[in-house]
């Protein structure tokens, strides 16, 4: 019974490693695109924060 469990773990581990490396290669270009979006979004948020601050001040 233990040998079956061990064998299952041995077969699962390379699959998870493969999945992680694949998802890394898929996600990595998306991340580089989203960093630009993130910069845009953060500048948008900071500008909206200043508007909000101005409303608070008045």
Swiss-Prot record:
An annotated GO cellular component of this protein is:
membrane
Q: What are the protein's UniProt keywords?
A: Membrane, Transmembrane, Transmembrane helix
Q: Where in the cell is it found?
A: Membrane
- Membrane-crossing ranges are 5-27
Q: How does it sit in the membrane?
A: Single-pass membrane protein
Q: What is this protein called?
A: Putative uncharacterized protein YDR034C-A
């Amino acid at each position: 019974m233990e040998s079956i469990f061990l064998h299952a773990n041995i077969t699962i581990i390379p699959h998870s490693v493969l999945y992680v490396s694949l998802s890394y290669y898929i996600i990595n270009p998306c991340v580089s695109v989203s960093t630009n979006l993130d910069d845009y979004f953060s500048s948008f948020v900071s500008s909206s924060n200043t508007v909000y601050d101005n409303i608070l001040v008045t």
